Amino acid sequence: MHRTNRISPYVAAAACVFLAGAGTLSLARSQPAPSATASTSLSYEFFRDKVEAVFLHKREGHTRCVACHTVNNVMTMHLVPLSPGATTWNEEQSRQNFQWVSRVVVPGYEDSLLIKHPLDEKAGGDLRHGGGQQFASKDDPDWQTLRAWVMGAK
């Protein structure tokens, strides 16, 4: 009798999660290390008033950033889940989002993951964003908002 060696679905799922995490971590390591004061050089007010709205905006053919980046997973960028019935974050949640998102930003660095990762490859982005290329070009107003924050807008 010949026994077929089959991989368990659980092992396959664990391998996929591991490989997805490894790819994301290598992306995070590919940008320069932020200085100790990186989060203080980014404007919390601009983030709260303009950047968080980008994460909530529904774009044609895509899901909202908040849909994937609030689940407990191995993604580099994480957002606080919205409170039940809420359409935006409260002050405490926004401060936590600011801290978490600041980790994927090097202030003033044009290739920070936050602005490169969701940008279409033809426009200078990369292919590894599991949520697809959210921004077709650098002319997209939401992409320009993210870039403005990364580049130091107040």
What are these regions (language model features)?
Residues 12-22:
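Bacterial N-terminal signal peptides
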Residues 23-154:
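Aromatic- and Gly/Pro-enriched helix-to-coil junctions and flexible linker segments
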Residues 1-4, 20, 33:
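Compositionally biased, low-complexity segments enriched in small residues
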Residues 2-14:
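Bacterial N-terminal signal peptides that target proteins for export
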